[in-house]
A protein has these predicted regions:
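A short, structured loop/turn motif at beta-sheet edges
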Residues: 17, 27-33, 99-105
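Short, surface-exposed linear segments at secondary-structure transitions and domain or protein termini
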Residues: 18-24, 45-48
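Extended, loop-rich substrate-binding clefts of extracytoplasmic carbohydrate-active enzymes
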Residues: 1-17
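Solvent-exposed residues in well-ordered beta-strands and their adjoining turns
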Residues: 27-29, 39-41, 111-115
């Protein structure tokens, strides 16, 4: 119950081998948008927003390393974003507002990269990964077998 409106949700989460981002597939009844967010922990990092490619990111220090967090939303379904800041630890967020399709479904990708993994050395490299991931969603590999 959300302010008098009954909302129901079905969710399937999957992760392709070798990917840094999990796929979230959600069926919702009772609303036409959802918000998916990144926790900004201690607010010591840098946010990145690319509405054209449908992603939000946060690059932050983590212990003796750094982490990149990200959300990628398939083309034309991110209808906005919100940067919510507070002084309270782990309560600041960067939200992507996502439109459900006509079947009350939505899909988005979320995950992280760790500097110590050797995959990403900087915010720039992390955001290049998000751009490439977004481009792959826009241009999927198609196979024809005869």
């Amino acid at each position: 119950d959300a302010a008098g409106t009954k909302i129901s949700e079905e969710k399937m989460i999957s992760l392709d081998y070798g990917s840094n981002l999990s796929r979230f597939e959600i069926i919702l009844k009772g609303t036409d948008t959802i918000s998916a967010g990144l926790t900004l922990h201690e607010n010591k990092g840098e946010i990145g927003i690319n509405e054209k490619n449908g992603w939000l990111s946060y690059w932050e220090p983590h212990e003796d390393s750094e982490l990149g967090l990200g959300i990628v939303v398939p083309e034309n379904t991110m209808v906005g974003y919100e940067h919510y800041l507070t002084d309270r630890k782990d309560e600041s967020n960067l939200f992507a507002h996502i439109q459900l399709n006509t079947e009350s479904k939505v899909a988005y990708y979320a995950g992280f990269g760790w500097k110590k993994s050797g995959q990403f050395k900087s915010k720039k490299e992390w955001e290049a990964y998000l751009n490439k991931f977004s481009e792959c969603l826009k241009n999927p590999l198609l196979l024809t077998i005869n």
